[in-house]
Amino acid sequence: MTSLKRSQTERPLATDRASVVGTDGTPKVHTDDFYMRRFRSQNGSLGSSVMAPVGPPRSEGSHHITSTPGVPKMGVRARIADWPPRKENIKESSRSSQEIETSSCLDSLSSKSSPVSQGSSVSLNSNDSAMLKSIQNTLKNKTRPSENMDSRFLMPEAYPSSPRKALRRIRQRSNSDITISELDVDSFDECISPTYKTGPSLHREYGSTSSIDKQGTSGESFFDLLKGYKDDKSDRGPTPTKLSDFLITGGGKGSGFSLDVIDGPISQRENLRLFKEREKPLKRRSKSETGDSSIFRKLRNAKGEELGKSSDLEDNRSEDSVRPWTCPKCFAHYDVQSILFDLNEAIMNRHNVIKRRNTTTGASAAAVASLVSGPLSHSASFSSPMGSTEDLNSKGSLSMDQGDDKSNELVMSCPYFRNEIGGEGERKISLSKSNSGSFSGCESASFESTLSSHCTNAGVAVLEVPKENLVLHLDRVKRYIVEHVDLGAYYYRKFFYQKEHWNYFGADENLGPVAVSIRREKPDEMKENGSPYNYRIIFRTSELMTLRGSVLEDAIPSTAKHSTARGLPLKEVLEHVVPELNVQCLRLAFNTPKVTEQLMKLDEQGLNYQQKVGIMYCKAGQSTEEEMYNNESAGPAFEEFLQLLGERVRLKGFEKYRAQLDTKTDSTGTHSLYTTYKDYEIMFHVSTMLPYTPNNKQQLLRKRHIGNDIVTIVFQEPGAQPFSPKNIRSHFQHVFVIVRVHNPCSDSVCYSVAVTRSRDVPSFGPPIPKGVTFPKSNVFRDFLLAKVINAENAAHKSEKFRAMATRTRQEYLKDLAEKNVTNTPIDPSGKFPFISLASKKKEKSKPYPGAELSSMGAIVWAVRAEDYNKAMELDCLLGISNEFIVLIEQETKSVVFNCSCRDVIGWTSTDTSLKIFYERGECVSVGSFINIEEIKEIVKRLQFVSKGCESVEMTLRRNGLGQLGFHVNYEGIVADVEPYGYAWQAGLRQGSRLVEICKVAVATLSHEQMIDLLRTSVTVKVVIIPPHDDCTPRRSCSETYRMPVMEYKMNEGVSYEFKFPFRNNNKWQRNASKGPHSPQVPSQVQSPMTSRLNAGKGDGKMPPPERAANIPRSISSDGRPLERRLSPGSDIYVTVSSMALARSQCRNSPSNLSSSSDTGSVGGTYRQKSMPEGFGVSRRSPASIDRQNTQSDIGGSGKSTPSWQRSEDSIADQMAYSYRGPQDFNSFVLEQHEYTEPTCHLPAVSKVLPAFRESPSGRLMRQDPVVHLSPNKQGHSDSHYSSHSSSNTLSSNASSAHSDEKWYDGDRTESELNSYNYLQGTSADSGIDTTSYGPSHGSTASLGAATSSPRSGPGKEKVAPLWHSSSEVISMADRTLETESHGLDRKTESSLSLDIHSKSQAGSTPLTRENSTFSINDAASHTSTMSSRHSASPVVFTSARSSPKEELHPAAPSQLAPSFSSSSSSSSGPRSFYPRQGATSKYLIGWKKPEGTINSVGFMDTRKRHQSDGNEIAHTRLRASTRDLRASPKPTSKSTIEEDLKKLIDLESPTPESQKSFKFHALSSPQSPFPSTPTSRRALHRTLSDESIYNSQREHFFTSRASLLDQALPNDVLFSSTYPSLPKSLPLRRPSYTLGMKSLHGEFSASDSSLTDIQETRRQPMPDPGLMPLPDTAADLDWSNLVDAAKAYEVQRASFFAASDENHRPLSAASNSDQLEDQALAQMKPYSSSKDSSPTLASKVDQLEGMLKMLREDLKKEKEDKAHLQAEVQHLREDNLRLQEESQNASDKLKKFTEWVFNTIDMS
C-alpha cells in the first residue's frame, strides 16, 4: 500500500517549522512546505470561501462553508482525499506560489478567527478579512478537494493546535507502520481529535503494525455510510455568524487561538452535538465524489466545472434515490454471492479502496476501548495516531460500543466484540417448531445444524446443481458444514476453462476495470426444456462480488435469429444482462494460458485451504496476554488437548503448510502442531512451542506469529480467569475460541467452548449447544476444527480483510485490462457503416415469455419476507434454482432462509403474497407489493422445480356426534376419512396433509395440540396439501431420505443428548405427564451402530439401559401420567423385552395412546393392577434388562412375559433401524422414539399407522364399537371410549375403551395383557384413528403411521414400507428377539408363537369379548388398537379384521402383532374380540381390508390365548393354545378348527427350539393371555409374510402360499399389507422365523435386529418341529381348531425346514436377506402410497411383485438344487456304468472260473 509518510529528507523541515500562527496570534508563513502547498492547492486555499455569503454551486469554498469553515483538509481526510497522489495534483501543487500559500494559510487562520471571536483570544482586522475574500475569489475554481472526508477532520475543534502541525502529523501516519511513539507530544496534542484527552505516553506496545485503512467505522455497511448525505443543502450557505459559532466552539490552546474544545466557552456536549451535525453532510459529499462520472476522470481531468455539475446533481439526490441494482429477471444466478452483486454499489464504491482511513481493528479495538472512561475522555496512551480511536466510535455518535453483555465463566463481555456462549443457534425466519417456542432455540438450532442434513444459511453457496448431482448430497449430511466459502469461485474453472469461450477486458468510465467471460453452450438438459442454447456469463469488477450465472438464448431480445449455430451477437447479450456496462470499452483478451490462469486466480482469490491458528495457554488464575505468553511450557492438561487436536511435527524439513514457521534453522521452535480437516490444512502456532525469551515480558517471538493470526484458541485450565479480548492488543486477532478443560487427565475429561468475535465478523457455525460439555473424542475435535475454519472464513468478510482483498483484486483487473487485450471490440461488425445508413434499423425480436422459468440457476425476485421470530418484514431477494430456495436479506446481505426445492410440499398464493410449505409443514411467507405478476411467476417457477402443489382451504363440519370424520397422524397427514362423511364431502381425502388448522401452522403443534385444536374448535378451517394422484401424501426429500432427529412430539422435552452426540451420560427419566404435552423423557443417544447392536442383543436380554433410554416415554392421550396408568404393583405382570421397548408398554395401556412409560429400562416385570377403566399399561420397569430376561425365561407361568415378547419388540425396533441403514444415527434414534412413543401413545401409533393404513380406514374408523376392544370385556359405549381418547376426530369415543373389569384373568400372561392394553390404549389421532385403534386400525395405524412418518423410513414411500416391513420386521425381529430372548422364554413361548389358530379365532369373531361389545368392525378396531399398541413399537401388527377369515390366516406378518393382540384376546376366553395384529400388518403395508379388518395369523397369539386357559400348562405355548381354543368357540366363524389346531400346535409345539422357528409367534402369544382373538392377530404375524416368506426356500414357498391364502380371505388384505411391509422386513422376518438360520441372521442383522441378535439366532439351532403335537384332552378340542392348528403346524414345519436350509447356507441366506431388504426398500414407495389409499390394484401388484421376487429367489435355489441333483444323478449313472462293467467283469471271471473248475473236475 502506498504510504503518505513523508520522506526522511523532508521530515526535518517539517519538524523544524514553527506553527502557522505564533503564540501572539500573528500568522507565520513558511513557503517551503511542499505538503502544505499540496494540501492547500487541493483544498483550494484552506478557507477561501468561508466568508462568501453564498457559495458557488460546487466550488471549493462552498464545499466547506458550513461543515468545515475555513479548515484545511487534515488528518485522514487530507491523506485520503486524493490517494494515491495523482501527477496532476502534484504538479498543480508545485505550481502554486508562495503568495497563494501564504494567503491560504492566512485565510485559514482568519477563517477561524475572523468573526468577532466570542471568547477567542485573537480577532482579525479588516486587512485580514479582505485577504480572505481575495483568496476565496482567486481559488474558487481550483481543483476541488476530495469530498470524501470525515467531518471530524474538517472541524475546527478537531484541531486545537496549528493546522500545519496537524498536517505534518497526518503525513507521518501512513499505513500505521509508523508507531505512535515516534511522535512528539506536542504533535500528538495538535492532531488528536477534540473528543479525546491528550496524553503524554502515546504509543502502541502490542499488536500488528499494519492496521488496514478503511472507509467508515468498523462494521459499517456502505449504505450506512450514505445515510449522512441527505442534508447537504442545509450546509450550502452558512453565514459568518454560523461560522463564528463553529469557531467559538473549537478554540485550540496549542495554537494562538482560544478554540480549545475542552476549555472553550461552549460545553463539551455542545461540541459533540456540532460534531455530529457536521459528520453526515461531509459523508454525503464524499459519496457525491464517486458519482456517475468516472473517478479516474475526476482525479485526472482539469475540467472542474463539468465535474462540479455532475457532483451537484448527485448531491441534490436523496439517499432513497440510490437503490440496489436489480439484475434482469432472465438471468439465472449460479451462486448466492452473484445474487448479492450490486452494480450501483460497484460504481459508487469503486474507489473506496483508495479512500480508506486507518482503523484500530480486531482485539486492539477492544484494548483501546477498555481504556476509555467516556466518549469524550479517551486516553491517548494506547490509541493509534490520528483517527484510530475516532474510528472506534459509531458513525452517528461518539458513544462507545458496549459489547453484547454476554458473559460466563469462560469469556467476559467486551466492547466491539460479540460473544457466543451457547444456545445462540442460527437465525430463522420461517415458522417451524424450532422457533415456535416449543423448546429452546439453542437446542433446536444446535441439533438441527449439527445433526441434520440441512445446509446452514452461511453454508449455502452454489445454487445451480447439475442434474447428475441432484441425488442426496453427501456433504449435506455431514455433521459439520464449512461455512462462508465462496464455492461459486470455481465457476470459471468448471464451465469455461479449457472450453470454447470469450474473454473481454476493458476500463469502463463508471465501473473501472472490468473483465467479462462468455460461453455459449448447448447442455443436454436444455433440449427438454425449450431453448437448446444457454449463455454462461461472468462479469467482474473491482468489487469482491462477481456476477455469475447464465441466461437462456430464448430470453434475450435480439436482432438475430435465435437457436442458430451462429448464435446471438455477444454485444446484445451483454447489453441485456448488464445494461449499465459500456460494451464499447471492451476488447477481446488474448487467448493464452496466462490469461485464463490469471482469471482463475482472480476468481479463486478468496479460496484458501491453508490456515494458521494461534493457541494461547492460560493457566489457573491467569487472564492477561503477558501471562499467557510467558507460560514457558505446557502442562499435562494442555498436552492432552494438543494431542487430541493435531499431530506434533518436526519443523525442520517439514514440507507441508508451514504457516511462516522456519523449517530450516529452527528459529521458530523445533516442533509445531499440524492437522488436516476435510480439505483444509491447519498449522497451529502454539505459544509453548514457539521460542521463549526469558528477558522479554512481551515475548515478541511468540506474539510475532500468534498476534498475526486471525483466529486464536485460548486454552484455559480449571481456575483460569474469564477471557476478555481487551487484554489482547492485535489488529489481526479477530476471533477467539475459548476452550476450558474439566477433569483433566482423567477418563471423564471434557471441554467447554465459547467464542468471542469482532463485531464486524458475521456469525458462524457449528453452533455451540447450551450447557453442553464435550467429552474428549473425535467428534469434539471435528467440532472445534470446523468452528476454527468457519471463524477464519467469516473473519475474511470483515471490513478490514475485505479492503485488503479488494485492493488486490483491483490490481489484478488493472493488469488484465491494460496488458492482455487485443484491439478487437466486442462488436467488430462496423467496417462499412455507410452500407447500413440507408436501411432501417433492425428491430429486436421479443424474448420468449417465461423462458427463464426453466433455467437451472436461481431466478431472483425482490420481495418482502415475514420474519416470524421478530414479527417484522424484511426486504429480501428470493432466489429459486433447480435445487435451492433462498431468501437473502438486502440490508445485511446474508442468507436468512434456505431449503431444498425437493423439500417443498406446497404453497398458498394470493395476488400479493405467497406462503411456501416445506419439509414437515414448516412455512415461510413472502409478499410483493410492486408487481402482482411476480407472485404468479414465483408459483410457476415452484411448479417447475418442485413436486409441490397449490394448497386447498376447506371448512369442516361435525356430525351429530361432534366428530369431523377423519383421522390425522402426528405428521398432520390424514390417515383415514369416513366415506361420504362431511370431511369426505368437503374434499378431504386420505393422504392429504394438514398444514394449517384454524390459521395455526401444524408445524408448530404437537400431535396432542393438533388433535385438541380439531376437537375443540367451533369452526374448523384447515389448509391442506392434496396428496399425489396415487393418494400418497406429499413428502419432502428430507422426510424420505433421512429420519427426523426427534420424535413426533418434538415439543415434549427430549433430552439434548438425544439430539446432540456429545453428552451421553443422561438416562431417560420417567416423568409423569400431566397432559398431552408432558415432555417425553429423552434417552441417551448412542451411535447408530451401538444402538442397533444393543437393540439386537439376543438371549432375550434387554438392550443396555442406554438403548432402552433411547425410547422416550409418552403420556396417555387422555393426559394422565403414565405412572398412574401403569403401576408396578398392578396384578398383571408385564415383562418387557428391551427390544419391545415401547411395544409392551403400549399393549398394557388401555386408552392412552401413549400409555407406556419410557422404556428407559426395559428390564423387569411389573405387577400391575388393572385400572378402574379396565386397562393396565405395561411399563418398562426400571428393573435391569437381565432381570427382565430372567423373568421372561421363567415363562412357565402366564404371568411372566416370554422373552420372545420382549424380543419381538426389540426386534421390530431393530428391524426398523436396520432398514434405515444408511440413514444417520439421528434418524435411527428417531425411529426408536417413534416406536416408543406410539407404544406409549396408542394415538401416536395410530398416528403413525393411519397414514399407511390400506384397509378401508373409514370403516375401521367408523367402527367405534371396535374401539371398545379395550381389554375390558365390558362393551363400553363408543362415546365412553372416545372421551378418553383426545386424538380421535372421527370417533373420539372409539379411541379408548375402558372397562371396569380386569383386563386379564389371573392366569393371563403379561404379554397378553400388554397386547390387550395396547388395544385399549390406542387412541385415534383425529378420531378415526381411534376407531381404527381397534384391532385393524391400531395395528395398521402403528405400522402405517410409522411408515408414513418421515422417521419411519429413508424415503417417504420407503418410510412407509419401512414401517410395514417394520411390522413384519417387528414380527421377525420379535421372533428373532424371541429367539434370542427365547434362550429363556423361547422354550416356553415357542408354542405360543403357534397362536395362529387363536389369531384366526379372534379375527373370525367380531372379537366380541364377554364383557365388551365388538363387531367385526370392532374387531378391526380392536386390532387397530392392538396395532396401535404395537405402533408404540414401530412394529405393531395387531389389526382388526372384519371377517373371521382374515384372522384365521396365520402367515400374516402381523403375527408379531398378533402376539400383542393375542395377549389381549387370550386374556379371557369370553373376550373373543381381539385386534388382529395381522390386520395391523396389512395396514402397515398399506392394504386395507374391505371389511375394515386385517388378517392376523399368529401362532403365538393363539398360544397366548391358550395360556389364559384354566389349564395353564407350564409352557406358555400350552396355555396360549388353550386360550385360543376357548376363544375360538366364541369367535365368529373366523375362529375355526384351523385356529384351534394352530393353538394346540402352539401349545404343544415340542420344543423351545421349534418355538424358535415360531419365535415371533411366541412373542405375540405370551403377551396375550386372552383367547383366540388375539391369537388371530398373531396369526397374521405368522402369515406367510412372517414365517414362510422369510424362511428358507420351502419356508418362502409356504409363506407365499400363506400370503395368497390370506389375500383370498378377508385377512388377505392384512396379509397384503403385511406382505408389502414384508419386502422391507422380509429379511428380518425370515430371520425371526429361522432364528437359528444363519442366512436369517444376515438378513435380520441387516434390517431387523442388531448384529448381536443375529448372532444369537445363529447360536440357537432351529429345532426340528417334530411331529405335530396332539392337543391336551382337557383343552376343549374343536375340529376347526385342529384344522387350524394343523395348518399352522404345516407352515411351522415349512419354516423350520427353510430355516434349516438357510443354516446350511448362511451366506446365500444373508445375500437373500439383503436382496429382500433392497426389494422392500424398492417397494417402500408404492406401499406407502397404497397405505394412504384404500387397497388398490397397484398396491396389490406391488405386493405380488414382492412375492414374485421371493418366488424367483426360491426358484433360483430350486434350480441350484436341481443342478446339484443332476450332478448327483450323473455321478450315480457313472457309478452304475462302472458297477455294470465290474459286474460284467466279475461275471466273466466267474464264468472262466466255473469253466476251469468244471474242466478240472472233468480231468480228474
From Swiss-Prot:
**PDZ domain segment(s):** 967-1045
Q: Tell me which Gene3D superfamilies the record gives.
A: 2.30.42.10, 6.10.140.210, Rap/Ran-GAP
State the residue spans of region: Disordered.
1-157, 277-297, 380-401, 1067-1128, 1144-1207, 1268-1306, 1327-1366, 1379-1475, 1505-1536
Q: What keywords were assigned to this record?
A: Coiled coil, Cytoplasm, Cytoskeleton, GTPase activation, Methylation, Phosphoprotein, Synapse, Synaptosome, Ubl conjugation
- PTM-bearing positions, type Phosphothreonine: 1330, 1551
CDD domains documented for this protein: PDZ_SIPA1-like (cd06745)
Q: What is this protein called?
A: Signal-induced proliferation-associated 1-like protein 1
Annotated organism of origin: Homo sapiens (Human)
* Lineage start: Eukaryota, Metazoa, Chordata, Craniata, Vertebrata
Record gene name? SIPA1L1
